[in-house]
Amino acid sequence: MSEKDNNLTPWQQKHLEYQKRKAEEAKKEKKANQPKKVHFSSPFLKSLPKTEKNFDDTRDEAESAELLEEGFETNNEETQSSEAPIENEKIIAQLEQLSQENEYEYEEEQIKRPSRFSSLFKGSAPLLKKMWPALAVVVLVFVGSLYLISPLSKISTFSVSGNANESSEQVALASGIQTSDSIFNILNNKEKIEATIEQKFPRISAVTINYHFPNRFEAIVKEHTNSVYVKRNNQTYLVLNNGYVITTPVDATKLEKLPVLQNFNDEEVKTFVNAYETLKPAIKSLMTNVTKTPTDATKDFIAIDMSDGNQVRVSLSQLADRLPYYPSVAKQVQAPQVVDMEAGIYTKPKAAYDAYLSQLSTSKSASISAQNAKKTDASSENTAQSTTTSSN
């Protein structure tokens, strides 16, 4: 016992011993109910090293004993009728405060302690700055190699759009593209593939192959439009707007409202179509039938029947220049009229013009007959003279 304990009265000493026993019993009972000590209520204390925990346990037990003695002494000085549970609550509160202080100190120490990774990479910044271009190249080469061996570098689908007369299967077959082909190979030969398709199909005027991420290709097709028909040997053929004549005959019952050229050869067809496509739609829609009517002065003279009842006569070589004047002329005349554009522009009723042509044809026939008669008479005279000469 301490000197203070010796100064106590026998009753006080017994009471002190009783309180100590009660405190120990309460402590044991608390340990039995709560496996973890009060100062372990913080998660920090659980993570401490074993040596630190033992040190804290020893320190806490010493402090608890001192606090217990001080509490008993204080209570004895103030009052001898205090209850043990009140003292225990004060001790527990003080122990919890000590635990919180220890946790705060440990957190501050952890913040100040340098990280293992920071010490590992300390001083490596200059080296990384020098090496990053090489590292970037290596990464790009690696990613590129992975892409080249992956299915994404091969074409997955090839589609065709804009085609009305040629099937998508035929266009895809003409392109030569297969699903196992490399995307880069197709991109490098893109223009060549487009030209091949255009040459294979006369109806196709232009082809554009577009790439769609990640590995799809689309051929956008633009086709030639239908321009006119040409009739040869009682068969009708379609002519495209580039002057190309489709060799397959067209059903006469399924003709569109397009001009029909009578017995034009391929060169004449192309010349007519080139001029025809420059005209306004209003004029083109009036033209129905085109025939060749050559004259002595104009060998490429043609007659164009119009849906308004008039007929235009113009040279094939001047079609694009002269025909645009027709609408203004048609407003000033009453159909049916013949608008002659061979030498200037003048109009004549169709019946009178036909009579004029008939008279002209008769005169021409008579002239030809007279010339033939003269040739016959001259031939007869020559024969008679040669006979007389031989008899002499």
From Swiss-Prot:
Belongs to the FtsQ/DivIB family. DivIB subfamily. HAMAP family: DivIB. GO terms for cellular component: cell division site; plasma membrane. The chain crosses the membrane at residues 132-152. Residues 1-88, 368-392 are annotated as: Disordered. Residues 1-131 are cytoplasmic. Cell division protein that may be involved in stabilizing or promoting the assembly of the division complex. Residues 153-224 form the POTRA domain. Residues 14-32 have a biased composition (Basic and acidic residues). The lineage of its organism: Bacteria, Bacillati, Bacillota, Bacilli, Lactobacillales. GO terms for biological process: FtsZ-dependent cytokinesis. Residues 153-392 are extracellular. This is Cell division protein DivIB. It is found in: Cell membrane.
